[in-house]
């Protein structure tokens, strides 16, 4: 798989990613974190980050600091991999005896239109997973929009 950091390092570039293991001056986006605080106990909450794996500890520590129980959150460092591809793999790995995925709803909060487009393309109508989606499957994307002094959510569906 394409990894620009690894590929540049193989060419001899020295790349210092140590800052990515630190959560610096985070700004809580309460329109999202308030929702996270109210997820039911039977839901599975994942935090997908494009950062590398060593950032997961600081991210989880930050969630605890803002009173989100990090033990109920599963972090995934995609390391630049497509978030849509990660979701496809997750769905394929959670197959029930009836041949359908046990993931029947994905709520995805994202500020990057590029990432939103990727997820919509790979989840909404993908022949690779269409037949394993449960009949009641829902993908609900919320675009996180920064309006200067506050954030809003724009709902996007397949």
What are these regions (language model features)?
Residues 1-81:
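Alpha-helical substrate-recognition element adjacent to the catalytic core
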Residues 39-43, 69-71, 97-103, 129-138:
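Short helix-terminating capping/connector loops at secondary-structure junctions
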Residues 47-49, 108, 143:
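Structural beta-sheet core signal
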Residues 55-65, 86-89, 115-124:
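A short acidic (Asp/Glu
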Residues 70-78, 97-98, 152, 157:
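Short, surface-exposed loop/strand segments
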Residues 78-86, 147-154:
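A short acidic, often aromatic-flanked loop/helix-cap motif at beta-alpha or helix-coil junctions
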Residues 83-114:
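Conserved Lys-Pro-Asp/Glu-containing loop-to-beta segment of HAD-superfamily phosphomonoesterases
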Residues 127-158:
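A short, conserved beta-to-alpha structural element at the edge of catalytic cores
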């Amino acid at each position: 798989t394409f990894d620009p950091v690894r590929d540049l390092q193989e060419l001899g570039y020295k790349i210092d990613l140590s800052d990515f293991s630190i959560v610096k001056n985070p700004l809580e986006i309460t329109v999202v974190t308030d929702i996270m605080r109210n997820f039911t106990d039977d839901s599975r909450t994942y935090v997908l980050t494009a950062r590398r794996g060593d950032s997961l500890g600081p991210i989880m520590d930050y969630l605890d600091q803002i009173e989100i129980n990090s033990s109920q959150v599963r972090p995934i460092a995609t390391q630049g991999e497509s978030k849509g591809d990660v979701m496809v793999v997750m769905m394929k790995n959670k197959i029930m005896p009836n041949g359908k995925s046990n993931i029947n709803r994905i709520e995805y909060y994202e500020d990057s239109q590029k990432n939103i487009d990727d997820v919509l393309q790979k989840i909404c109508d993908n022949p690779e997973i269409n037949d394993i989606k449960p009949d009641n499957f829902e993908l609900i994307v919320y675009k996180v929009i920064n309006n200067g002094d506050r954030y809003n959510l724009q709902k996007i569906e397949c």
